[in-house]
Amino acid sequence: MKRRAFLAAAAAGAALPLARPAIGGTAKTLVFVPQANLTSLDPVWTTATVTRNFSLMVYETLYGRDQAFNPKPLMVQGHTIDDDGKRWTMKLREGLVFHDGTPVLARDCVASLQRWLKRDAVSVTINARVDAIETPDDKTLVWRLKKPFPLLAHFLSKVQPQPVIVPERLAATDPFKQLTEIVGCGPFRFLPDELVSGHHAAFAKFDKYVSRQEPASYMSGGHKVLLDRVEWRIIPDGATATNALVSGEVDWLELPSPDVIPVLKKASGVNTGLLDIYGTVAILRPNSSIAPTNNVMLRKAMMAAVDPREAMIAAMGEDESGWHAPMGYFLPGVAAANDAGMAFRTKPWSVDE
């Protein structure tokens, strides 16, 4: 492959799911260096980012979030809401097939969601509102609610932990134990015989994958599979990974260290860019349960004393295209972003405050 790229994560944004690779031209195989070793293959069992990214290759969810973080139908055709908001009826799309050749059925979805709810904190909210999830036929899920719950689709489009759909026989696995067989209905099949922990993982195009017809928008819409094969090379050493990219041994470096980015920008044949516009959040979190940082006045003083721009320069370098500071509680660029609580950056607190 002639085209090589890397993903530089912004240091001031939440860790959100990455867009699936879509390399055009005649490329058939993509060699990708993930940010960490792939130690777990179960996105319900762990919230590790590398496992989440792995799951985007092989699994799908009933709903996916678009670029504005709105839930959109993914595995389902859509839903209807009646009984004064207390009954949601969801219909699965036609043609959905698992990697083992079996059709995706409503009971697979219910079993998968029940396993997910035993691990995700949102279960407290959902279970308090759900009377039952029924499957009147193989393609239909009916949620009977105790009271209206407009955020149901939003919760089902979560990206971490992901409510991925697996066959009922696998969904019966104890949620506190990892899945040992990887079978989804996503665009790529995982190739377990090629897994070498700490070194290599591989995926093959799933020929029976049925993409949606809408334009892709982040985790929603139609994701076209333009590759026959994807290989993950685990290269923990940053310098080694950089050399592999420059020499053409690999095609995509997900998370290069900031100090090598200037080198990559000058390297022949290497394309650099910021694909994850939200990135990861850098946080200084004092322990508020013990002295002296259980004193809110001290924590406010610490907050005022730390200049986030200086911190980001120290961590990421002076090129501000790769980070954002200061930031409020929500991610820069999202609808909820605001400056609440940030006034002290422009107007210092008084002693009384």
Locate each region found by the language model.
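N-terminal export signals
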Residues: 5-23
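N-terminal lobe/hinge region of extracytoplasmic solute-binding protein
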Residues: 33-83, 114, 183
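A bilobed periplasmic-binding-protein/Venus flytrap-type ligand-binding module shared by bacterial periplasmic
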Residues: 66, 204-207, 277-301, 305, ...
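Aromatic- and charge-enriched surface segment that lines or borders ligand/interaction sites
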Residues: 77-122, 136, 142-144, 241-244, ...
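Surface-exposed binding/hinge segments that line
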Residues: 91, 125-196
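Ligand-site clamp/hinge motif
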Residues: 93, 211-263
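Ligand-binding "clamshell"
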Residues: 127-128, 262-274
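Structural transition elements
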Residues: 322-353
